[in-house]
Design a protein with these regions (language model features):
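N-terminal targeting signals for export/organelle localization
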Residues: 1-54
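Conserved segment of the thioredoxin-like fold in thiol-based oxidoreductases
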Residues: 51, 101-143, 148-155
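A short beta-strand-turn-helix
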Residues: 56-77
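Extracytoplasmic and endomembrane cell-envelope/extracellular-matrix remodeling and assembly machinery
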Residues: 58, 62, 118, 177-179
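Structural cue for short, hydrophobic secondary-structure segments
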Residues: 78-82, 114
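Conserved redox-active cysteine motifs that mediate thiol-disulfide chemistry
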Residues: 81-98
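Thiol/disulfide oxidoreductase modules built on the thioredoxin-like
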Residues: 130-131, 138-184
Length: 186
């Protein structure tokens, strides 16, 4: 019985988020203490109550998209980390679309950061899921510069930034996302 429970629990855990998976024989990274300190510092720097870190990556047509171009011009900016191959991301996107539809005209902008590697899949998913907001991706998967800056280890993930550039929330889902945005825009 314990084995069955553990198998079910493991299955549920694996389906709740898309985690970075690296085969040991495929990719081994040795991280020295100095590099680990830099990673830790960056993760701490992008936590709640800190100033956002700008991301500048190619957009769908190759143009450079910068988060800083939206912060300050909007009351709130949501950086949404996702990928076309991530089932939980696709299931969460209707909530993000709903938030955009309800609050875009009231001061919300969303900037999507895709962890895709295939441009055609990325662009098709944008269209199929109704994402009308700015998008960016360097098509490097988990090595995406933006994901590294924000210490993203699983997706979907997001960062909510106020008009002053302060990170006010991270990893909001479903109704929590919509309710937090509503409260911040009052």
């Amino acid at each position: 019985m314990k084995k069955v429970f553990l198998m079910i629990a493991t299955g549920l855990l694996l389906t709740t988020s898309c985690n970075q998976k690296v085969k040991v024989d495929e990719k081994i990274k040795v991280v020295d203490s100095e590099t680990m300190e830099e990673i830790t510092d960056m993760a701490a720097a992008t936590g709640v109550n800190n100033t956002f870190v700008d991301i500048a990556l190619p957009g769908p047509q190759g143009q450079t998209v910068r988060v800083r171009d939206y912060v300050g011009q909007n009351k709130l900016v949501l950086i949404d980390f996702w990928a076309s191959w991530c089932g939980p991301c696709i299931r969460e996107l209707p909530h993000v679309v709903k938030a955009y539809e309800l609050y875009h005209g009231k001061g919300l902008e969303i900037v999507g950061v895709s962890l895709d590697k295939d441009k055609a899949s990325w662009l098709a998913a944008i269209e199929q899921t109704g994402q009308k907001w700015p998008q960016m991706s360097d098509l490097k998967g988990w090595d995406c510069e933006g994901a590294l800056f924000y210490g993203i280890q699983s997706i979907p993930a997001n960062v909510l930034i106020n008009e002053h550039g302060k990170i006010i929330a991270r990893d909001l889902r479903g109704e929590d996302l919509i309710n937090t945005i509503a409260q911040q825009l009052q």
